[in-house]
C-alpha cells in the first residue's frame, strides 16, 4: 500500500457483506485486505465470542479500536466489525478517515444471514425485533461517518465492486 493513500474502510451492520465485498475487491484489484475481526482472532488466539465471554464487550471494543489503528496504514481495504462505531474512540477516529463506505442491507435479509450464527455474539439468540433495535441504534452513526452508502441487498457483489472502482478512480487512489 502507498502510505500516502487512505484505505477504503467498510462499515455497516453485521451480515451486510463487508468481509465478502472487501475480499472480492482486494482480490480483483490485487490490493491488501484486512478483516478486523479475523485480525483480532489471529492476534489474540481467541474467537470473538470467546473474547466477549471472557472479557466482555467493552474489552472487545477496545481491542477492535487498537487493531484498527494498527491496520490503518498497512491495508488498502479494511472491513470493520459492525459494532466498531459503539466505541467513541473508534467512532471519532473513523470520522477523520476519508474513504468510509457503508454497506447496508434489509434487516430481514440480515436476520436470515446471521440468525443463530455462533460467531456473532451480539446476534446470538436475538429476535428479529431485538436485532432491528440494535440495527436502528447504529444507523445514525454509520450515516454520520460514511462517504458513500451501498445497499448490498439491492446490488450484486460485482455491481458494488464497479461502484467502488469508480470511487477509487475518482479519488485517484491505488
From Swiss-Prot:
Keyword ATP-binding attributed: yes
Domain of life: Bacteria
Binding-site residues, ATP: 15-20, 120
Pathway: Metabolic intermediate biosynthesis; chorismate biosynthesis; chorismate from D-erythrose 4-phosphate and phosphoenolpyruvate: step 5/7
GO biological process entries: amino acid biosynthetic process; aromatic amino acid family biosynthetic process; chorismate biosynthetic process
GO molecular function, one term: ATP binding
Gene3D superfamilies assigned: P-loop containing nucleotide triphosphate hydrolases
Binding site for Mg(2+): 19
PROSITE patterns in the cross-refs: SHIKIMATE_KINASE
Catalytic activity entry: shikimate + ATP = 3-phosphoshikimate + ADP + H(+)
Cofactor note: Binds 1 Mg(2+) ion per subunit.
Cited PANTHER family: SHIKIMATE KINASE, SHIKIMATE KINASE 1, CHLOROPLASTIC
Family: Belongs to the shikimate kinase family.
Function: Catalyzes the specific phosphorylation of the 3-hydroxyl group of shikimic acid using ATP as a cosubstrate.
Protein's recorded name: Shikimate kinase
Species name: Staphylococcus aureus (strain NCTC 8325 / PS 47)
Upper lineage: Bacteria, Bacillati, Bacillota, Bacilli, Bacillales
Gene: aroK
Amino acid at each position: 500500500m502507498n502510505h500516502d493513500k487512505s484505505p477504503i474502510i467498510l462499515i455497516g451492520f453485521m451480515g451486510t457483506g463487508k468481509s465478502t465485498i472487501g475480499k472480492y475487491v482486494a482480490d480483483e484489484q490485487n490490493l491488501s485486505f484486512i478483516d478486523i475481526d479475523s485480525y483480532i482472532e489471529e492476534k489474540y488466539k481467541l474467537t470473538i465470542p470467546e473474547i466477549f465471554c471472557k472479557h466482555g464487550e467493552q474489552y472487545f471494543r477496545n481491542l477492535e479500536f487498537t487493531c484498527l489503528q494498527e491496520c490503518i496504514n498497512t491495508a488498502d481495504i479494511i472491513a470493520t466489525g459492525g459494532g466498531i462505531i459503539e466505541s467513541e474512540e473508534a467512532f471519532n477516529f473513523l470520522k477523520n478517515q476519508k474513504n468510509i463506505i457503508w454497506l447496508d442491507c434489509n434487516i430481514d435479509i440480515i436476520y436470515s444471514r446471521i440468525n443463530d450464527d455462533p460467531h456473532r455474539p451480539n446476534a446470538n439468540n436475538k429476535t428479529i425485533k431485538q436485532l432491528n433495535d440494535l440495527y436502528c441504534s447504529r444507523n445514525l452513526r454509520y450515516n454520520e461517518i460514511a462517504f458513500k452508502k451501498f445497499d448490498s441487498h439491492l446490488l450484486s457483489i460485482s455491481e458494488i465492486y464497479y461502484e467502488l472502482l469508480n470511487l477509487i478512480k475518482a479519488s485517484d487512489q491505488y
